[in-house]
């Protein structure tokens, strides 16, 4: 066998072996492929089954959610229906109450109308009486003229006096008689009017005052800040006093640090600055960080906080007295009065008290109670700005009321409550009276000893300046002046006129809270000795 044949045989064997090997691989691959296909098909079936189960689960959940949503919607609908029914019932009840109040108001108006009708009838009757009295006086004047003419002729006939001499005698007699009659008439009229006025005024004032309850404690000019321990005083002073100097410079308040245990005193005449200082110092003590930068930060912060607090004070006071629909700026200005004092009395508390007293007086007198309260509440509003704006607190308050378009009666009340202008309504007079009552009640106000002594001296000086006065004494803390006259200089009739003159001088020349009683005493003593 040649080499070529051997090679071909070898190649043939190799090909056969390769063919057999390939056939085996193909069969194996086919089996693997079938296995993979079956496995994939099984997984696909599992996925389909899982998806189907998931879909059924989601469907069940959707059904459950749908039922729950339908139930929730039904409950919400029922709840809204109940709320609407409750609101309807409440509105119907409010409507019934409103109708009831309107009916009561109508009855009150009917009663007032009947009262006015009766007053008109009384006025007509008084007018008729006045006409009759006028006619009677005219006839009396004619009779007196006739009698005077007869007297003149008789005097001329008897005394042979001239017309001028007779006239002088008659005038002298008439003048003396009229002086005595005038003094008696004045005394009787005053006694009668005083008795009736005192009785009526005491009744009205007692009814008004007993419905008002107020504090009788006057405001102080110092505030006390408590400290956790005395070691805090050194921290407040600071190194070389820099903390206390910064505090006093920023607040304008004196810080008094003495031997008082665990306390620091803040002294200053301006309550607003003193309140800012008190708030700042309390926060510094509580925080513990006391240095100039922190002091400056807290002072500025508390200034803004106090502005907000003043508005709250004004709103609360306006609500208390029933002064509705006040301009927000007016309420803020009224809130400033919480930090103002007059003779030691808190001006906002005084305004609230005047509002209540004026309202009670107006109710007793048949005037508009709400308007009287509003006017009384605003009567001292000018005191909130009298340090910042030129003019008296009356002028400032009047301009503020005009600016914010208050009722003309309120404007006139503010302008007239110290007698600067003429009161144009009964409410203005009632507010002035309420102002005097609030200021004059015991404990409401406090005067310095210098002003107190000066007022007593001025009172005695006015009384002793009249002719015939021997001496005068101011009694009861200046609420009464007793004038002793010389009996040989003034008669009993003349001291009645003297009392009125002293009273007028005091009203014109002095400012004082409340009333001053003027008592003139004429005493005659006859002395002899038995030997």
UniProtKB/Swiss-Prot annotation:
Single GO term (MF): RNA endonuclease activity
UniProt-annotated location(s): Cell membrane
Record keywords, A-Z: Cell membrane, Endonuclease, Hydrolase, Membrane, Nuclease, RNA-binding, Transmembrane, Transmembrane helix
Known EC number: 3.1.-.-
Chain segments annotated as coiled-coil in the UniProt record: none
Membrane topology according to the record: Single-pass membrane protein
Domain KH: 221-281
The protein's enzyme class: hydrolase
Keyword Lyase assigned: no
TM ranges: 3-23
Any one of the GO BP annotations: mRNA catabolic process
SUPFAM superfamilies reported in the protein's UniProt record: Eukaryotic type KH-domain (KH-domain type I), HD-domain/PDEase-like
GO cellular component entries: plasma membrane
PROSITE patterns from the UniProt entry: HD (PS51831), KH_TYPE_1 (PS50084)
Keyword Plastid among record annotations: no
UniProt-listed InterPro entries: HD/PDEase_dom, HD_domain, HDIG_dom, KH_dom, KH_dom_type_1, KH_dom_type_1_sf, Ribonuclease_Y, RNase_Y_N
Domain of life according to the entry: Bacteria
Domain (HD) ranges: 347-440
Biological role: Endoribonuclease that initiates mRNA decay.
NCBIfam families: HDIG, RNase_Y
Similarity comment: family membership: Belongs to the RNase Y family.
Protein name per its UniProtKB record: Ribonuclease Y
Taxonomic placement: Bacteria, Bacillati, Bacillota, Bacilli, Lactobacillales
Gene name as annotated: rny
């Amino acid at each position: 066998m040649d080499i070529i044949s051997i090679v071909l045989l070898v190649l043939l064997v190799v090909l056969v072996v390769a063919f057999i090997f390939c056939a085996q691989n193909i069969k194996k691959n086919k089996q693997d492929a079938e296995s993979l296909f079956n496995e994939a098909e099984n997984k696909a079936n599992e996925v389909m089954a899982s998806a189907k189960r998931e879909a059924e689960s989601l469907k069940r959940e959707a059904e459950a959610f749908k039922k729950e949503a339908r139930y929730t919607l039904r409950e919400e609908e029922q709840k809204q229906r109940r709320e609407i029914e409750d609101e309807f019932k409440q509105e119907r009840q409010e409507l019934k109450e409103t109708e009831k109040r309107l009916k009561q108001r109508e009855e009150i108006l009917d009663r007032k109308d009947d009262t006015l009708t009766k007053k008109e009838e009384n006025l007509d009757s008084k007018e008729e009486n006045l006409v009759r009295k006028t006619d009677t006086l005219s006839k009396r004047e004619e009779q007196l003229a006739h009698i005077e003419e007869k007297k003149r002729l008789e005097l001329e006939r008897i005394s042979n006096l001239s017309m001028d001499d007779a006239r002088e005698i008659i005038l002298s007699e008439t003048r003396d008689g009229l002086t005595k009659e005038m003094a008696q008439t004045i005394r009787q009229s005053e006694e009668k009017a005083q008795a009736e006025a005192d009785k009526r005024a005491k009744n009205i004032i007692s009814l008004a005052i007993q419905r008002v309850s107020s504090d009788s404690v006057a405001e102080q000019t110092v505030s006390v800040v408590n400290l956790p321990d005395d070691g805090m005083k050194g921290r407040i002073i600071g190194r070389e006093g820099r903390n206390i100097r910064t505090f006093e410079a920023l607040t304008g308040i004196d810080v008094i640090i003495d031997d008082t245990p665990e306390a620091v005193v803040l002294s200053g005449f301006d309550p607003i600055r003193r309140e800012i200082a008190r708030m700042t110092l309390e926060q510094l003590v509580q925080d513990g960080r006391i240095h100039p930068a922190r002091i400056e930060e807290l002072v500025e912060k508390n200034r803004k906080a106090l502005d907000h607090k003043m508005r709250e004070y004004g709103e609360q006071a306006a609500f208390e007295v029933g002064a509705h629909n006040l301009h927000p700026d007016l309420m803020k200005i009224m809130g400033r009065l919480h930090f103002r004092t007059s003779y030691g009395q808190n001006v906002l508390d005084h305004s609230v008290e005047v509002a209540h007293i004026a309202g009670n007086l107006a109710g007793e007198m048949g005037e508009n109670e709400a308007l009287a309260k509003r006017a009384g509440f605003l009567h001292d509003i000018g005191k909130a700005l009298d340090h910042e704006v030129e003019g008296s607190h009356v002028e400032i308050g009047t301009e503020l009321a005009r600016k914010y378009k208050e009722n003309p009666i309120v404007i006139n009340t503010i302008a007239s409550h110290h007698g600067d202008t003429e009161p144009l309504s009964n409410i203005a007079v009632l507010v002035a009276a309420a102002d005097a009552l609030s200021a004059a009640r015991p404990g409401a106000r406090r005067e310095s000893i210098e002003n107190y002594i000066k007022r007593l001296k001025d009172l005695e000086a006015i009384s002793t300046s009249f002719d015939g006065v021997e001496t005068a004494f101011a009694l009861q803390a200046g609420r009464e002046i007793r004038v002793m006259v010389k009996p040989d200089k003034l008669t009993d009739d003349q001291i009645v006129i003297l009392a009125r003159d002293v009273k007028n001088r005091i009203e014109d020349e002095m400012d004082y809270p409340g009333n001053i009683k003027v008592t003139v005493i004429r005493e005659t003593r006859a002395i002899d000795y038995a030997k």
